Amino acid sequence: MVFFHQPLPLCQRLYYMDIDLYRYFIGRDDQSVNESVMVKRVDQQLRVTKIMIDAVDLYALPESQKKLRAYMFNYLSMMMAISSVFLTMDGRPEAFEKKTELWQYLKNHDERVYNKCSHSVAGACNLPGTLGHKITLWGYHVAQKIFKFN
């Protein structure tokens, strides 16, 4: 994710090449996309999300790149949602502290992106309190059934 996020604003054209560069066997229990593995490795997810927050000032992109800005914002928002959901799944007080720290990190870095993100699906994954956590997990499981992930 980081390898394309930072240089993307500098790209003029993208080309699709229909070749296998990497083969990935899906279905192993210890796979990184396995839900329980993601919860255990949430620190890696947080590290990548913070790198993406730092990588590009979305509002410094020229008006001619507003579609790129929207795409990059949506991707960052998705990363915030994923991090928030897996930290909520963890359920430990330290995990909730990490979630608060992540959102504060985004706010300190760029308040405009924070405000927009907190009023998106990612913000809905950051609802406070026990009821908010239950709603977040319920929404995750509904999305899981609709989009067939994990």
Language-model segments: which ranges?
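C-terminal, non-catalytic tails of nucleotide-sugar-dependent glycosyltransferases
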Residues: 44-71, 112-116
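Short, charged, amphipathic alpha-helical segments
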Residues: 66-74, 96-100
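Membrane-interface aromatic/basic loop that binds lipid-linked glycans or pyrophosphate carriers
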Residues: 89-150
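Secondary-structure edge/capping motif, primarily at the C-terminal ends of alpha-helices
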Residues: 28, 56-63, 86-91
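Hydrophobic core segments within long, regular secondary-structure runs in both alpha-
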Residues: 42, 46-53, 99-107
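Amphipathic alpha-helical repeat scaffolds of TPR domains
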Residues: 70-86
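Nucleotide-sugar-dependent glycosyltransferase catalytic core
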Residues: 4, 10-48, 90-97
